């Protein structure tokens, strides 16, 4: 055996011996670890057994349990006081106040309104089954809380009134009102008092209102230093109308800032929305399409943190609302005065509502009647006429028909002027065609425009004569578009096959849903679109001959727009679709009548006379400046054309 072989055998033997020693030690350590784990498990088991025996002994000893409960009770008393501890353990009661318009149910748990039922309005249901009254507060989610801090043993303790059961002093009646008083004792001789007042005497300003007064009695010495008292008001509203989509379009959280002439809101969208205001807020309202709940402060809220969350379609609910407000507080504060509105979004009612101080708080602006111009038309023209007709006519379908006729009569001078302008354009069409043939090139567009304007002037035609009258009447037409979907007067009013003019009329329920259209067929919407096709085709025939550029828009005017309206309006108010149907039929009748009685030859004769007069008429300074401007623009275009040609 050579030297290298001997060295290799020795090294291998040494490595094997070291490996055996190392693994033996690891095995020994592992066994020791297992013994340690087993010992710890046995110790834990014995401790748990001992603890269980101690618990059994404590349960077997009622004196020890009572002592523990007494000690816990004393800790609560030391922290909150005897009055609040007793209030938390008290059994809640239910109380009810009622007048001809509202039934209001209260609970002494937090001394809050739990349910409000409207006597005159019912929830949508199929014909013959509509008997469920509108409920504005959901008892499961209605919540009101006042939060403030007390001084207790050198500590500030937070008090949330919703956690405590108030003591009811009962309901008293007299002087045309009912008063419910509930109190929460905070300390001996110190308490918070809630007073709710519901009026029996009929008064448009108070029919749907409650006064809500908060009084702090003897609290000032034990109140901690704080600048505001917090208020939290939340609720979940029911779906009351036929269409979730249509109702949601007008359901939002609204609020008004002091001294403002308009109302703000969080938007009328699905999903969630929120807003935090560090400025004062006059009132906050949980608004639906036709009903609202509003919380109004006499001295304004110091701030407002508001939000809503849209519920799922088919859940039976619309939105969850939450509003956290603050009221300014000083040691001299003796309480606060509020008003609570629970009622319809009816202009005649809301316009009479005043705040706790008797001031106008613009509650009627809750109804989305449009911006300043459109809203003005609705408030001062549409609504007064509508209310006047209601006094003498029972059928709202007939009222809409008469209102449409009145609108057409009102705008007839503008319609006639627009038609006359179109007729004049039709008469001078040969001259216009000659100008188009004379100046076919793009660089001559300015010169063609000049001669076209001269032709209009000689013929006595205003370039805006056709569209300006239509623009003037747009605010009124848009006002009616905004009025019908939010008019509670149409709610529950049937007409022909429609059960409710405030909702869509379904003559056929589909077993499936068509995207952007829905799962039903609205007959008023369908008839509106059919008449729109007829009206658009008739209007196209009238304008295409006088305006060649309209020829390429036939598909859009005659077919595309009515098809789009069919999808848009299938879920809209049947009253609105009925109005557009009647409006288009009347417009076609008027246009056919004017077409029959307006003589093109007579118009041509008058235009020839105007041309003769224009020849001898001196040009005005404005016309001279306009012609000079046109010449300068034409020269600029020629220079640009030359520059482009030079670059090539």
Model-identified regions with their sequence ranges:
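Transmembrane alpha-helical core residues of multi-pass small-molecule transporters
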Residues: 12, 407, 531, 582-586
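Core hydrophobic alpha-helical membrane-spanning segments
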Residues: 8-21, 477-480, 526-531, 564
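Membrane-interface amphipathic helices and adjacent TM-edge segments
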Residues: 26, 40-44, 410-477, 533-570, ...
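Conserved catalytic motifs of ABC-family nucleotide-binding domains
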Residues: 479-533
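Transmembrane helix interruption/hinge and helix-loop junction motifs
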Residues: 3, 393-396, 568-577
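Transmembrane alpha-helical segments that form the functional core of multipass membrane systems
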Residues: 365-438, 447, 453-457, 477, ...
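Residue-level signal for the membrane-embedded core of alpha-helical transmembrane segments
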Residues: 13, 397, 401, 471, ...
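Membrane-protein biogenesis/insertion across secretory and organellar systems
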Residues: 1-409, 604-648
């Amino acid at each position: 055996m050579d030297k290298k072989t001997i060295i290799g055998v020795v090294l291998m033997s040494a490595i094997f011996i070291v490996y055996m020693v190392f693994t033996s030690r690891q095995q020994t350590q592992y066994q020791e670890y297992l013994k340690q784990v087993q010992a710890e498990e046995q110790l834990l088991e014995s401790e748990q057994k001992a603890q269980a025996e101690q618990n059994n002994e404590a349960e077997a000893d009622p004196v020890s349990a009572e002592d523990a409960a007494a000690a816990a009770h004393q800790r609560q008393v030391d922290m909150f006081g005897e009055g609040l501890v007793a209030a938390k353990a008290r059994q809640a009661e239910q109380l009810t106040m009622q007048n001809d318009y509202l039934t209001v149910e209260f609970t002494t748990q937090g001394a809050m309104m739990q349910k409000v039922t409207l006597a005159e309005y019912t929830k949508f249901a199929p014909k013959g089954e509509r008997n469920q009254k509108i409920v504005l507060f959901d008892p499961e989610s209605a919540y009101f809380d006042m939060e403030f801090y007390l001084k207790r043993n050198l500590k500030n303790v937070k008090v949330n009134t919703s956690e405590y059961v108030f003591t009811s002093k009962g309901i008293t009646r007299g002087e045309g009102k009912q008063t419910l008083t509930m109190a929460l004792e905070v300390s001996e001789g110190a308490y918070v008092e809630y007073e709710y007042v519901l009026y029996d005497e009929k008064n448009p300003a108070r029919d749907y209102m409650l006064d809500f007064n908060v009084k702090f009695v003897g609290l000032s010495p034990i109140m901690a230093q704080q600048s505001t008292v917090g208020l939290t008001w939340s609720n979940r509203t029911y779906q009351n109308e036929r269409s979730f989509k249509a109702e949601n379009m007008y359901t939002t959280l609204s609020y008004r800032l002091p001294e403002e002439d308009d109302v703000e809101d969080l938007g009328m969208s699905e999903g969630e929305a929120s807003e935090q205001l560090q400025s004062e807020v006059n009132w906050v309202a949980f608004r639906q399409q036709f009903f609202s709940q509003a919380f109004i402060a006499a001295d304004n809220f110091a701030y407002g943190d508001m939000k809503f969350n849209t519920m799922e379609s088919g859940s039976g609910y619309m939105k969850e609302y939450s509003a956290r407000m603050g009221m300014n507080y000083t040691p001299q504060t003796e309480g606060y005065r509020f008003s609570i509105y629970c009622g319809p979004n009816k202009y005649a009612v809301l316009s009479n509502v005043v705040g706790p101080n008797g001031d106008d708080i613009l509650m009627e602006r809750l109804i989305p009647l449009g911006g300043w111009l459109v809203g003005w038309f609705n408030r001062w023209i549409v609504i007064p006429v509508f209310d006047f007709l209601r006094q003498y006519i029972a059928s709202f379908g007939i009222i809409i028909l008469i209102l449409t006729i009145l609108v057409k009569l009102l705008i007839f001078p503008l319609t006639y002027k627009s038609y006359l302008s179109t007729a004049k354009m039709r008469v001078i069409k040969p001259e216009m065609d000659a100008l188009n043939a004379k100046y076919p090139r793009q660089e001559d567009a300015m010169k063609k425009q000049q001669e076209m304007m001269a032709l209009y002037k000689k013929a006595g035609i205003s370039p805006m004569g056709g569209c300006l009258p239509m623009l003037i009447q747009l605010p009124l037409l848009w006002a009616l578009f905004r009025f019908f979907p939010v008019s509670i007067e149409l709610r529950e009013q049937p007409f022909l096959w429609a059960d409710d003019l405030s909702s869509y009329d379904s003559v056929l329920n589909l077993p499936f849903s068509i995207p952007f259209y829905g799962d039903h067929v609205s007959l008023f919407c369908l008839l509106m679109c059919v008449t729109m096709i007829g009206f658009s085709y008739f209007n196209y025939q009238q304008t295409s001959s006088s305006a060649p550029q309209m020829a390429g828009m036939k598909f859009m005017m005659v077919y595309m727009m009515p098809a789009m309206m069919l999808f848009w309006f299938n879920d809209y108010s049947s009253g609105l679709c009925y109005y557009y149907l009647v409006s288009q039929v009347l417009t076609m009748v008027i246009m056919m009548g004017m077409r029959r009685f307006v003589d093109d030859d007579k118009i041509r004769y008058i235009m020839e006379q105007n041309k003769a007069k224009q020849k001898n008429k001196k040009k005005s300074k404005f016309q001279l400046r306009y012609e000079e401007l046109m010449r300068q623009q034409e020269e600029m275009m020629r220079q640009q054309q030359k520059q482009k040609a030079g670059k090539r």
